[in-house]
């Protein structure tokens, strides 16, 4: 279980309130598929994933990225109980989709990079530390069903 300080919660929620879920979600998922091409096997139905430009411009990637980040936002509302908040998604990704849980860590790290690029100097070292803690906690919660 991850325990967030009041300061970490403030940093996470403060930045989250400024995040364009559609834009950041699409970019994060797109970058995951470009940087870690083996993750594309989970998205066969998305059509053309043949190049970085095809992936980043793919409307299905963008739409699913928004869906992923929307679910991520729900976890932010439940920082004190990520495991419970993400239990159904953990079950779905384990039992039905058979996603390698390592991919949750990869996507979390990509998300931090995308946030840093979008928020520049506002994304301080303290902000990064809080978000790294969050994405690690989300990855652990999503991996729970696998154990």
Curated annotation (Swiss-Prot):
Keywords, in A-Z order: Heme, Iron, Metal-binding, Oxygen transport, Phosphoprotein, Transport
Gene3D superfamilies: Globins (1.10.490.10)
Keyword Translocase: no
Modified residues (Phosphoserine): 51
Cited InterPro entries: Globin, Globin-like_sf, Globin/Proto, Hemoglobin_b, Hemoglobin_oxygen_transport
Protein name: Hemoglobin subunit epsilon-Y2
Function per UniProt: Hemoglobin epsilon chain is a beta-type chain found in early embryos.
A single GO cellular-component term on record: hemoglobin complex
GO BP of this protein: carbon dioxide transport; negative regulation of transcription by RNA polymerase II; oxygen transport
Keyword Plastid set for record: no
GO molecular function, one term: oxygen carrier activity
Residues given in the record as heme b binding sites: 64, 93
Tissue localization of expression: High expression in yolk sac blood islands, fetal liver, and embryonic erythrocytes. Very low levels in adult liver and spleen.
Record domain Globin: where: 3-147
This protein's encoding gene: Hbb-y
Stated family: Belongs to the globin family.
